[in-house]
Regions:
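Conserved nucleotide-sugar phosphate-binding/catalytic loop shared by glycosyltransferases and other
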Residues: 33-76, 86
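Active-site and donor-binding regions of nucleotide-sugar-utilizing enzymes
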Residues: 4, 8-11, 15-26, 66-123
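Structural signal for hydrophobic packing residues in well-ordered secondary-structure cores
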Residues: 25-29, 57
Length: 123
């Protein structure tokens, strides 16, 4: 049985670093990859990197509603809550064996906290 891996990416910075590993996992018969995208990838301001992701021809892409917000405390906390809610919905409807996350921003912290709550190992 294939191991189901979710790779979370929210910006060009983490996607660029993980691009090769995403490609390898997606083309390895031992794994079933879901590339979970959100936040800046669909933003014109940040270059709509969603197009670059689509060009990789990843077999399974799931877009979550992580919409970039203004960087003030209240908006960031509302955004953080939205990210947790969206990640919970994803885990409720997808059986995932492990999650790959990379980043030093609050987006990945929200995803990591959700993984911990769902007992999903983080790679």
């Amino acid at each position: 049985m294939k191991k189901k891996i979710a790779v979370f990416t929210v910006a060009r910075s983490d996607f660029g670093i993980m691009k090769n590993i995403i490609h390898r996992i997606d083309n390895d018969d031992r794994f079933e990859l879901t590339c979970v995208i959100g936040a800046a990838h669909d933003s014109k301001i940040f270059g709509q990197t969603i197009n670059e992701i689509k060009e990789m021809k990843i077999k399974k892409i799931k877009k979550l509603k992580f919409n970039y917000v203004k960087s003030d405390s209240k908006n960031i906390m509302n955004y953080f809550q939205m990210m947790i809610d969206e990640t919970c919905k994803f885990f409720d409807t997808n059986k995932i064996d492990a999650a790959l996350i990379l980043g030093d921003r609050y987006e990945m912290m929200a995803i990591a906290l959700t993984c911990i709550n769902y007992n999903i190992p983080i790679m």
